[in-house]
Amino acid sequence: QIILRPAGLIILLVDVYRTKENGTDYAQGNYPRALVIVPTRELVVQVCESVELLTEYMDIRCVGIYGGTNIRTQQAAVYEGVDLLVTTPGRFMDIYMNGIIRTPQIKTVVVDEADRLMDMGFMPQLRSILEVVPEKHQTLLFSATFSTTIAELAAEFLAPEPVRIETGNPTTPVELVTQLRYD
């Protein structure tokens, strides 16, 4: 079963980047071409599984990195080659600060579930991550809600006039939210 997360949108971009750069069509060690930032390890696993299913015949290497596991095992996976890196903010900063990952080839950054990242207190790490990727890159920001805080985040990290795509009614609460009225 494929759970199509926003990472699915960049599969084609990764394929384009692979073939344009210096004629190489395979993952180049610890230099990912795309980065997906998600709030939880469960989402890292989910996104990687979906990408692997969708790119089964494309030779695109997706590596998931998250805390709570052996960093050496994850380091070995990165050094085998990575096109698409899916990670939680804290673990990305760990592997970046330890020189395990290099960012100059990153062309696309996906910030998935931005509202949850903010709720979980990951804004400092998110800012740090966006400071270490190349200035010239595309950022895709996904959020279930579009609060004032998310609008400020978009203004801070996205192009001056980003394309905004909405699905559903923005005033309709998510089904998981229970609204009560007390009199």
Predicted regions located by residue number:
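SF2 DExD/H RNA helicase N-terminal ATP-binding lobe
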Residues: 1-183
